[in-house]
């Protein structure tokens, strides 16, 4: 057909008086050109299928047809004998498979905090224990300085083509922010590798379909283009816990995506569930009134390859996320929906064998936008998440649910939003600033003398300020002195941060970047009531000033 089209076009420009011999000569010449093109294509395919054989015979570097069809990649030549430094050659091709370690880096991070969170370059979520310490503990007046290489990352990406329209991809990414029971920061500074991402992806260009299976950023996480893994618009902060208002998980999932000419994208993701409950210092864990008893989670076991020092929530169904994204040519826009199911066991202690399972439905909606106000120089962004039981998806890890008066779980309404700007004023420079908030609504109850829920106005909060000087309590997050109580249910977590990255070197040996970040974090607690001691509700707004620095070497970028 290709020949016929070309021939028909050629005939169209032949003058009417041209004789048949001249026309035949033109057709024969075109046939010879087509045959030469076919031989060249066959030779290219043969060379790409046998790259090692060509290298072993000393033949010139073979030409490999890249994934985008007419893109030609010529690998660099072999280094000369005795060369002191090998020529950088990653990403590479092996038997038609494209292998890249781009994204790997060696990091040295530092953190200074006005309040001691006992953390490194990845701050604890502000609501966590310890998180930001309260004024009733010695941690409040302690300064903190840490150095760490734990954010150093190993990344491996593999691409291959089934045929010109079907493609496979695998990606693995790990860092060292895990800590086993024998990890320490005193002598060996030994820490545990952990999975960040590990997934496989299938793409079909004809039907515009994509499928992902494995652990990746949640579909709920905002993207800068489309909605496939690798296009997430993650914050560029040094702090690995990012900023309140940034909604994210890295989660095991199965994702299906359809794209309409790469302009509109529609996706569905089935993801690993988990339920976040109030921390141990919170009265949100108060049990329902007798004789009702509940079981909201189970102890994880090492035999099941889970962390035996934590608990696993009772989950009966995956989290379901739907998302639509649009790339009309200027900016990127997203909307999404979320469905979740929380479950616990409820029994009446006076009735034998009365355990029964209760299920609570939760939901969320949200969206994001990315606006290239000055293309390649300045972009603005924003995102929002609202719903019942959405705390797990917030950077602050606010609770999803609490126990209700009848023993079943009741979802906590939450709101999260973020605004930010990223600028590239000159080559190799990136300046960023973000402001974000995570909020939770009160969800409380009182039955007789029993009170519970989240943000209950009857919870006692008179023990936030006075420091407990009792032995053994100095390094504990929340340590009210005897006769005082501090519930501290978090109503709001806020952060403003600003920072920059600067390329110090970029060339054949890779890339070296240095960065600085400053963040101001502030919590607001539900007030509760003082007791007969007359102590007012002080200490409702603990805060922290934090500074980070980082030096990172990317050998393959």
Roles of regions detected by a PLM:
Residues 4-15:
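C-terminal segment of classical bacterial N-terminal signal peptides
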Residues 14-121:
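N-terminal periplasmic/intermembrane-space "pro-region" immediately following the signal or transit peptide
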Residues 87-130, 134-284, 314-332, 371-386, ...:
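Outer membrane beta-barrel
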Residues 116-120, 182-190, 224-231, 278-304, ...:
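Outer-membrane beta-barrel translocator domains and adjoining extracellular loop/strand segments
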Residues 142, 148-153, 194-197, 249-251, ...:
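Transmembrane beta-barrel architecture of outer-membrane proteins
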Residues 328-496:
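Detector for outer-membrane/organellar transmembrane beta-barrel domains
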Residues 542-557:
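Outer-membrane beta-barrel "beta-signal"
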């Amino acid at each position: 057909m290709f020949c016929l089209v070309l021939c028909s076009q050629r005939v169209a420009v032949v003058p009417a008086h041209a004789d048949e011999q001249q026309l035949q000569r033109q057709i024969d010449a075109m046939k010879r050109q087509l045959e030469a093109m076919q031989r060249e294509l066959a030779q290219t395919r043969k060379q790409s299928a046998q790259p090692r054989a060509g290298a072993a015979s000393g033949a010139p570097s073979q030409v490999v047809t890249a994934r985008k069809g007419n893109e030609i990649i010529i690998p660099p030549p072999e280094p000369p004998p005795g060369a002191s430094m090998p020529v950088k050659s990653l990403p590479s091709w092996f038997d038609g498979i494209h292998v890249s370690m781009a994204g790997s880096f060696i990091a040295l991070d530092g953190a200074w905090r006005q309040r001691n969170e006992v953390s490194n370059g990845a701050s604890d979520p502000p609501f966590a224990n310890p998180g930001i310490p309260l004024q009733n503990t010695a941690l409040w007046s302690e300064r903190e300085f840490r150095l760490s290489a734990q954010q150093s990352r190993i990344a491996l990406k593999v691409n291959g083509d089934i045929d010109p329209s079907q493609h496979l991809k695998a990606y693995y990414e790990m860092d060292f922010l895990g800590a086993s029971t024998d990890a320490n920061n005193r002598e060996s500074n030994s820490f545990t590798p952990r999975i960040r991402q590990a997934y496989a992806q299938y793409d079909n260009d004809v039907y515009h379909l994509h499928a992902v299976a494995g652990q990746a950023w949640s579909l709920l996480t905002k993207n800068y283009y489309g909605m496939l893994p690798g296009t997430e618009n993650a914050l560029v902060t040094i702090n690995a816990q990012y900023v309140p208002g940034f909604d994210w998980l890295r989660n095991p999932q199965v994702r299906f995506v359809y794209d309409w000419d790469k302009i509109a994208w529609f996706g569905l993701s089935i993801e690993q569930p988990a339920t976040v409950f109030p921390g141990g210092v919170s009265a949100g864990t108060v049990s329902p009134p007798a004789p009702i008893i509940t079981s909201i989670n189970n102890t994880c076991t090492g035999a099941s390859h889970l962390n035996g020092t934590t608990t696993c929530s009772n989950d009966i169904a995956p989290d379901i996320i739907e998302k639509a994204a649009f790339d009309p040519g200027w900016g990127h826009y997203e909307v999404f929906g979320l469905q979740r199911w929380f479950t616990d066991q409820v029994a009446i202690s006076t009735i034998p064998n009365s355990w029964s399972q209760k299920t609570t439905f939760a939901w969320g909606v949200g969206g994001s936008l990315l606006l290239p106000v000055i293309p390649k120089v300045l972009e603005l962004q924003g995102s929002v998440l609202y719903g019942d039981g959405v705390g797990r998806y917030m950077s602050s890890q606010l609770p999803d649910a609490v126990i209700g008066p009848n023993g079943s779980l009741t979802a906590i309404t939450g709101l999260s939003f973020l605004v930010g700007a990223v600028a590239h004023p000159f080559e190799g420079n990136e300046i960023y600033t973000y402001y974000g908030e995570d909020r939770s609504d009160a969800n409380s109850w009182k039955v007789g003398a029993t009170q519970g829920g989240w943000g209950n106005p009857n919870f006692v909060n008179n023990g936030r300020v006075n420091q407990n000087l009792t032995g053994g309590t100095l390094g504990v997050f929340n340590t009210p002195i005897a006769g005082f109580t501090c519930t501290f249910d978090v109503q709001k977590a806020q952060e403003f941060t600003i920072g920059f990255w600067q390329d110090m070197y970029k060339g054949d040996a890779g890339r070296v970047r240095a960065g600085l970040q400053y963040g101001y974090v502030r919590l607001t607690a539900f007030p509760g009531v003082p007791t007969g001691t007359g102590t007012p509700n002080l200490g409702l707004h603990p805060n922290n000033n934090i500074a980070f620095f980082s030096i990172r070497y990317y050998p393959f970028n």
